[in-house]
Amino acid sequence: IIWSYNWGGRSDKNFARKHEYAWCYSKGDKFLFNSDDVRVERKVSKNLRTGKNYTKGTVPTCVWEKNNHTTSKDYCGWHATTKNLEILQRIIKAYTNENDLVLDCFMGSGSTAIACKQTNRDYIGCELDTDYITKARKRVKSYDRINTLSEFL
């Protein structure tokens, strides 16, 4: 999946690189794909030839455009490539069911862990940088507190 965006700096020496790749792997030859969980609204809601209405939406292409993070809380300023939570949630919903296990081999700021919590998945995160590990743990725990508090509001 390619996440395309149009924010951040520009270069005068080459085209601006305004995309990130998301690699999705699965154990074994068969993989799960929950197409109904990732459908998006169609630009055309009716087949002009048959008159059939498209009510379910359509499965998106492998290039997803999302120009910024949902909220400033979703973006952490200490990691250069914080991923968008909506993008991660869509990927996680597409390839896993609730209570499945997601492995993030490059945990960074912990965005995948947060998206897993928000979609009721378990996760394992791996990271080499001990500073990132400490900060990611704190960031993931802060989402736990927010969710717990919102249950009482």
Region locations from a protein language model:
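S-adenosyl-L-methionine
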Residues: R137-L153
